[in-house]
Amino acid sequence: MAQQRRGGFKRRKKFDYIAANKIEYVDYKDTELLSRFVSERGKILPRRVTGTSAKNQRKVTTAIKRARVMALMPYVNED
């Protein structure tokens, strides 16, 4: 039997931001887009958090790693 949640909290539906905006190529120079997929500490967020598809997650990960090598994005954000 399924139990109902208490408190009425409804979880937000995750969607693939890249597919929804019809972005074909994830550019490593577009740091504004890539910063959506990085935590405040600088770690790449997993698919279960961002809601991206596996294919687009690979594109994002590759672009973030390229941006880090080119010094466009930091490896670690320290406060």
Swiss-Prot record:
Name of the protein described by the UniProt record: Small ribosomal subunit protein bS18
Residue ranges crossing the lipid bilayer per the database entry: none
Gene Ontology terms: biological process: translation
A Pfam family matched in the record: Ribosomal_S18
Assembly and oligomerization: Part of the 30S ribosomal subunit. Forms a tight heterodimer with protein bS6.
Keyword line: Ribonucleoprotein, Ribosomal protein, RNA-binding, rRNA-binding
Gene name, Swiss-Prot/TrEMBL: rpsR
NCBIfam families: S18
Similarity remark: Belongs to the bacterial ribosomal protein bS18 family.
The keyword Ribonucleoprotein appears for this protein: yes
A single GO molecular function term of this UniProt record: structural constituent of ribosome
Gene Ontology cellular component list: cytosolic small ribosomal subunit
HAMAP family on file: Ribosomal_bS18
InterPro entries per the UniProt record, alphabetical: Ribosomal_bS18 (IPR001648), Ribosomal_bS18_CS (IPR018275), Ribosomal_bS18_sf (IPR036870)
Function: Binds as a heterodimer with protein bS6 to the central domain of the 16S rRNA, where it helps stabilize the platform of the 30S subunit.
